């Protein structure tokens, strides 16, 4: 539903963002546009050089926690192209393509590697920003380069994967290039000599699986564990799994011997954030209409027409409680957008 904002000079009809992000919070923006070609992207950037705007994919990793005072621009470029050499398939996908549909497309055309990343919501353009990952695989291993438009110069650039500063749910697009680049496409390399990755969780029980077997199991597990955002508003995992030193883990194990962990290297481990949150009794708790999901503590949901303020309140309560109990700082994975842009907990 639109909202009317009135000032001394004019009446402005604000655009509702509720259906444009999967959390479904009641927020609005000053204007909304859908960018469907590189040409229209250049035009939009030229017209908004001195105006605030926020770039959006499918809104699956974004929560609008207040009315945004600017234009929201949906990056909706489409197209998939495939080339190959002796060792790899070279896949060029436009930023507005659905990530899951790209996974399905590649599987259908016997180009394997993406199957562990099935059913991750969002667009191709969002994948490198977040360095999406699941079940032992992160998308960075397949990215050759990312094509983007510099929002200051309006010029197209291509940045190699090695320069993207990929990390755990992290990249240069969240830091040095945050709000400075519009991703328009991504080039992937899928090896022809495919090797399954089945070291994580339920996949470890698969015996000599095909790529289709892995895809099927990932879809099955994700559908069982995670609420469907089209039914129950959410943005998937709200917090990142924290990474701590082995020395810190040893100290924590003195007090919490059952704390699970996953070794990353000889010096660091990853702790499941869901376990930390569950230990503190947040699973199933409400803050107004926002709820910590009763089956998966890492997912916050819009259970009963919640608001952005309620989401921030519950997220901060969880973050502060984890810090107090475990001396671990939880970072939120979801992009929180307020009136003037990014909001931090």
Curated annotation (Swiss-Prot):
Protein name listed in UniProt: UDP-N-acetylenolpyruvoylglucosamine reductase
Job of this protein: Cell wall formation.
Superkingdom, natural source: Bacteria
Keyword Cell cycle (UniProt): yes
Active site feature: 169, 237, 333
PANTHER family per the UniProt record, alphabetical: UDP-N-ACETYLENOLPYRUVOYLGLUCOSAMINE REDUCTASE
Keyword ATP-binding in annotation: no
Pfam families given in the database record: FAD_binding_4 (PF01565), MurB_C (PF02873)
A GO biological process held by the record: regulation of cell shape
Cofactor(s) the protein needs: FAD
Ranges that cross the membrane: none
Subcellular localization: Cytoplasm
